[in-house]
């Protein structure tokens, strides 16, 4: 699998897990993460984030999004 496909797969997985954790739809999850820079964060920090547990990644996303004005 190419690096690009791995990054896409990881991002999709994170969006899905974030949706489940917060009891929102995957579309709402993506829109929220996009608006509050979570998607950008995953792209920029993939090299580190993909080595962490999904729980840790979700915590990182929650912290980042709150710092950028999110409230989930």
Indicate where each model-derived feature is located.
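C-terminal alpha-helical interaction appendages
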Residues: 1-72
């Amino acid at each position: 699998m190419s690096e690009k496909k791995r990054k896409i797969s990881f991002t999709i997985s994170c969006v899905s897990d974030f949706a489940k954790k917060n009891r929102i739809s995957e579309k709402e999850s993506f829109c929220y993460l996009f608006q509050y820079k979570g998607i950008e964060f995953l792209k920029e920090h993939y090299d580190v984030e993909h080595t962490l547990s999904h729980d840790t990644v979700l915590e990182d996303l929650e912290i980042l999004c709150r710092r950028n004005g999110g409230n989930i």
